[in-house]
Amino acid sequence: MIQGIIGKKIGMTQIFQEDGKAQPVTLVEAGPCVVVQVKTEKQDGYEAVQLGYGKAKHITSAVKGQCRGFGEFKVLREVDVDDIAAVSVGDQITVSDFKDGEKIDASGVSRGRGFSGVVKRWHFAGGPKTHGQSDRHRAPGSIGSTTTPGRIYKGKHMAGHMGNEAVTIRNLVVLKTDAEKNLLMVKGAIPGGKNTIILIKKTGK
C-alpha cells in the first residue's frame, strides 16, 4: 500500500465536535494522484513510487517522457510503499486510502515573511520602553563579546530572511475525509498559504 499522497492546501475552517467545542481544521484537496514510476531495490537500490499531481501548463520533453502518457503533471514526488509488487504504473491514489483518526505528517513550504527583525523572527523582548531610551524598542542588543573571542558565534540569532522554507509537521490527525470532493480535514494547522502544495505521508511510514 502506498503511504502518501500529494495535495493542495485550500484553507482553514472549523467543525463542531459532539461536545459542542469548535475544532480548527485545515482543508487539503488531496489527489487524485497517478503512479508514474515504480522504483525497485534491484534497479534503483531502494523501493518507492513516484506520484504525479495537478495539470501543468508547460512541460519539458524529459518530464513528458517520464509521465509516460498518463498526463502532464505539475508536481512529481516520491513516497514509500509497503508492498512494491502490488503497485504498478498508472495506479491512482485517492483520499479513500486514508481513514478518519489516522495520523499523518504534512510537508510544505512555509509562508515567506521577507527580511524580519529579531522580535518577529526570534521573539526577542526588545529594549526598555522608557528611562531615556530611543530607537531601542526592537533592537537586538549585544551580539557578542570584545577581543575574546573577537568574532560573532555561528548561529547567533539576528535579523534576516524569515519563512519560505521546507517545514514538516508530524502526528497530525485526519478528522474526516470526503472522497467525492477529494478533501482531507486535518486537525490543526499545516505549513504554507492558500494553494501551497502539500505532501502528506502516514506517520511512521
UniProtKB/Swiss-Prot annotation:
**Keyword Disulfide bond applies:** no
The protein's UniProt keywords, in alphabetical order, are: Ribonucleoprotein, Ribosomal protein, RNA-binding, rRNA-binding
Cited Gene3D superfamilies: Translation factors
Q: Where is this region: Disordered?
A: 126-150
What molecular function does GO assign, one term?
rRNA binding
GO biological process per UniProt? translation
Report the domain of life of the source organism: Bacteria
The Gene Ontology CC terms held by the record are: cytosolic large ribosomal subunit
Q: Does the record carry ATP-binding as a key word?
A: no
Q: Which NCBIfam families match?
A: L3_bact (TIGR03625)
UniProt similarity note: Belongs to the universal ribosomal protein uL3 family.
Assembly, per entry: Part of the 50S ribosomal subunit. Forms a cluster with proteins L14 and L19.
* Protein function: One of the primary rRNA binding proteins, it binds directly near the 3'-end of the 23S rRNA, where it nucleates assembly of the 50S subunit.
Q: What is this protein called?
A: Large ribosomal subunit protein uL3
Organism lineage: Bacteria, Bacillati, Chloroflexota, Dehalococcoidia, Dehalococcoidales
